[in-house]
């Protein structure tokens, strides 16, 4: 970590974790019983200066799993009609196989050893993702089983607001409320917000940290 070039590599920024921004739209709040209806996944990249940004986004409309509960209030809120054939929905398994493939490829390219979900109010998205993976009996998930980066918490600290739309606007990121509650739109705004916070922290001198030996040397000089 004493080498500034190493500190500008993604694999060193988050302890070997590759951040993957996710947003889901669902038919309720219960990941055990309610349908996952839409998911978007934004992959990130870091340039040679250590600035993190958006790489690409995957987006899937999802068929409700067999026996899934569909709460009318949730459908009215997100405007999704699960029966609409124009959605082009795929099964949970098909979507997650594609997501796993893309995430693992990007994770490997960044020389990271595991991926970590980034989301706004991350416990919600992480819960639905984890339950879908379990239902599909998919092995070797790239995602950490419980750790996440929650942009609601990060925004509360860095910007002073926890609502996604308000935090984005305060950070100078355009946000159209008419587009909100689309997994694709919300994921990319969440990704922009996460990148803004990480890059802002770096620009203020919060990263990279001094290595222990550098700190010791500096303390010795000052003494």
UniProtKB/Swiss-Prot annotation:
Q: Which cofactor names does the annotation list?
A: Mg(2+)
Binding annotation for Mg(2+) 2: 23, 25, 181, 186
Show which residues form the site (Important for substrate binding and specificity): 29, 77, 124, 146
SMART domains, alphabetized: EXOIII
Active site (record annotation): 181 (proton donor/acceptor)
Which superkingdom? Bacteria
Q: Which UniProt keywords apply?
A: Exonuclease, Hydrolase, Magnesium, Metal-binding, Nuclease, tRNA processing
Annotated GO biological process: DNA replication proofreading; tRNA processing
**Keyword Nuclease recorded:** yes
Per UniProt, the cofactor note for this protein states: Binds two Mg(2+) per subunit. The active form of the enzyme binds two Mg(2+) ions in its active site. The first Mg(2+) forms only one salt bridge with the protein.
Q: Which GO terms describe its cellular component?
A: cytosol
GO molecular function (one):
3'-5' exonuclease activity
Query: Record-annotated residues binding Mg(2+) 1?
Result: 23
Gene3D superfamilies in alphabetical order: Ribonuclease H-like superfamily/Ribonuclease H
Q: Which InterPro entries does UniProt cross-reference here?
A: Exonuclease_RNaseT/DNA_pol3, RNase_T, RNaseH-like_sf, RNaseH_sf
Task: State the name under which the record lists this protein.
Answer: Ribonuclease T
| Organism of derivation | Shewanella baltica (strain OS185)
